[in-house]
Amino acid sequence: MSTTVYLQKDREKSLLRRHPWIFSKAIDKVKGKPEAGEPVDIVDQRGKWLARGAWSPDSQIRLRVWTFKQDEQIDTEFFVRRLQQAQAGRELLISRLQLSAYRLVAAESDLLPGITIDRYNDHLVCQLLSSGAEYHRHELISALQQLYPTCSIYERSDVAVRKKEGLAERTGLIYGEVPPDEVIIEENNGIKISVDIKGGHKTGFYLDQRDNRAIAGRYAKDRRVLNCFCYTGGFGVYALQGGAKEVINVDVSESALELAKHNATLNKLDLTKARFEKQDVFKLLREYRERGEKFDMIVLDPPKFAENKAQLIGACRGYKDINLLAFQLLNPEGILLTFSCSGLMTSELFQKIVADAALDAGREAQILERMTQAADHPIATPYPEGYYLKGLVVRAI
């Protein structure tokens, strides 16, 4: 017998607008004893059917909606349909940019809550981030094997958010051959990037910054470029290819810097124009300021400063500080590419922080372009939380 979850009075409005989350406080009563991740029927206070979703007893997000169709069951064929729909939405992008790596599934924005899948050549890398995704693991994997029989499937569910769902972290091979230590992908019509699927950040690489790396390349010609929080050097590769006279890549990770150097070599770029600094970015930028160093272009792509609302005020201070330092280091007519990857940081707030940083640095500044996540990271219209990556191209006059 299926479980039915009744909502509090007037708490169905978000579902009527097709938002995929229901929080614990919106629930009136539960008829049945669902397992973690089990699909349940969601009804309003009068019993009118609204949606079918996954039960997450350990999360504040108590329900994640799978479907708004009452006759649609959550089985292997359901996942086949969702995956086919996701793949179809990316075909034009793959063809236009000659991609060998892309995000196949962007969780809620692809109507598959808690599931992220990236494809690197013939390797599918999955993150199962919710109780519902875990509960339907077998059906999801069966659907992937049916649609992508020649691809290996590797799991990278080693993320802290699983703890909020009462799930342990997990990584390892699910199907096929273990990915090699180095997987070389191509993007934007020929740029090569070395990816560490088993040990790299996220699923191995930041595919969401693909378009913005290309933008960086377009501004780099004849500029001295400082690439902060460089990770494996993607922005630096594009800057060198775009004609930068010097690129300084900065990260705290020695292994990331080695991979950044390798990525420059893969693309046959002139390493005499590149430096790789193992440093704390905040500390190094202050040292540069004291020494009077100047740059023509700075890229700020920091890690997420705010994981929850309680951390947002501190995150604002961090973004303000790092952007202030950047403005102080830029030559006249310098270009700043600055990003926030926190979903809690609105575009308006981020722009205000950058504006305040320019003001405190005594610089006139203009926004030339706004940047966001690449098109294989879509944002479902009822789900604004899917919009997480914000970026600005700023001219410091």
UniProtKB/Swiss-Prot annotation:
<dbReference type="InterPro" id="IPR041532">
    <property type="entry name" value="RlmI-like_PUA"/>
</dbReference>
<dbReference type="InterPro" id="IPR019614">
    <property type="entry name" value="SAM-dep_methyl-trfase"/>
</dbReference>
<dbReference type="InterPro" id="IPR023542">
    <property type="entry name" value="RLMI"/>
</dbReference>
<dbReference type="GO" id="GO:0016434">
    <property type="term" value="F:rRNA (cytosine) methyltransferase activity"/>
</dbReference>
<dbReference type="Pfam" id="PF17785">
    <property type="entry name" value="PUA_3"/>
</dbReference>
<comment type="similarity">
    <text>Belongs to the methyltransferase superfamily. RlmI family.</text>
</comment>
<dbReference type="InterPro" id="IPR015947">
    <property type="entry name" value="PUA-like_sf"/>
</dbReference>
<keyword id="KW-0489">Methyltransferase</keyword>
<keyword id="KW-0694">RNA-binding</keyword>
<keyword id="KW-0963">Cytoplasm</keyword>
<keyword id="KW-0808">Transferase</keyword>
<dbReference type="GO" id="GO:0003723">
    <property type="term" value="F:RNA binding"/>
</dbReference>
<keyword id="KW-0698">rRNA processing</keyword>
<comment type="function">
    <text>Specifically methylates the cytosine at position 1962 (m5C1962) of 23S rRNA.</text>
</comment>
<feature type="domain" description="PUA">
    <location>
        <begin position="2"/>
        <end position="81"/>
    </location>
</feature>
<dbReference type="GO" id="GO:0005737">
    <property type="term" value="C:cytoplasm"/>
</dbReference>
<dbReference type="InterPro" id="IPR002478">
    <property type="entry name" value="PUA"/>
</dbReference>
<dbReference type="Pfam" id="PF10672">
    <property type="entry name" value="Methyltrans_SAM"/>
</dbReference>
<dbReference type="InterPro" id="IPR029063">
    <property type="entry name" value="SAM-dependent_MTases_sf"/>
</dbReference>
<dbReference type="InterPro" id="IPR036974">
    <property type="entry name" value="PUA_sf"/>
</dbReference>
<protein>
    <recommendedName>
        <fullName>Ribosomal RNA large subunit methyltransferase I</fullName>
        <ecNumber>2.1.1.191</ecNumber>
    </recommendedName>
</protein>
<keyword id="KW-0949">S-adenosyl-L-methionine</keyword>
